[in-house]
Every structure is written in C-alpha cells, then in structure tokens.
C-alpha cells in the first residue's frame, strides 16, 4: 500500500493582504523538494493573485452548493476554478456553528465540488 504524502493546510480565515500573498508566494517558491503537499486557503479575493507554482496548491474556504443564480455573496465551484483553486474546505466547524450548515448542505457542496473537479 502506498503511503500518502502529508498535507499542510494554511487556512487564512478572514485575514491576509496582497502583501502577505507576495511574501507567502516568494517564500514558497524557494522551498526545495521533497516537501509535504502544501495547500494555501486565503480569502477568495486573494486566490487569483497567487502566482502558479508547482510546489503548492490553492484552496477556497467555502463555496456554494448552487451552480449559478441569484445567490448574493456566494461563490460557485466554477468561479473557484477560474480563480485558481484546486481544493475547497467544506464542512468546517465554524460554518456549522456560526451559519448553521447542516449535513444535507455539506453533502450537496461535496457533490458539486467533486463534479466540478475540485478536491474537497
């Protein structure tokens, strides 16, 4: 059985800036292989500002279970892909506690993410 490579996730929550994007991408670009898999999950507004490097991946902190439509403030899976995300955090305890996300919604989000090609 092949051993899984460790995954290090940096969830920025509602923090960060364009300066931090630059600092983080500069620091990550000089790291030497082999590394654990690195996943950076900044606020969605910063996703497209990260340069595309092979030594890390980008993720979003949330996404809508809806594909398109009049859902003010929501972000679709396709929008995340366009912004450069390969992953998305779904079912985080803060979303459950603060926004009342239930298993049915989380299940739908997982399905939408996988169907779109995102890794939940």
Regions found by a protein language model. Name each.
Residues 1-75, 81-82:
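Conserved N-terminal beta1-alpha1 strand-loop-helix module at the mouth
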Residues 1-9, 81, 85, 93-120:
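Expand to "…catalyze enediolate/carbanion chemistry for C-C bond making/breaking, isomerization
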Residues 40-41, 90, 120:
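Short beta-strand segments at enzyme active-site cores
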Residues 62, 91-93:
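Short beta->alpha connector loops at strand-helix junctions that form conserved
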Residues 75-76, 109:
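Conserved sugar-transfer catalytic core signal across GT-A, GT-B, and GT-C glycosyltransferases
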């Amino acid at each position: 059985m092949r051993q899984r490579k460790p995954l290090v996730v940096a969830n920025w929550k509602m923090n960060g800036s364009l300066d931090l994007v630059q600092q983080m991408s500069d620091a990550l670009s000089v790291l030497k292989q082999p590394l654990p898999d690195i996943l950076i999950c900044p606020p969605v507004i910063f996703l497209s500002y990260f340069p595309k490097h092979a030594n890390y991946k980008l993720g979003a902190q949330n996404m809508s279970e809806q594909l398109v439509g009049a859902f003010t403030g929501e972000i679709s899976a396709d929008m995340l892909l366009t912004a450069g995300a390969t992953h998305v955090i779904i079912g985080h305890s803060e979303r459950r506690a603060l926004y009342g996300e239930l298993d049915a919604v989380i299940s739908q989000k997982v399905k939408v993410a996988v169907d779109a090609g995102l890794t939940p």
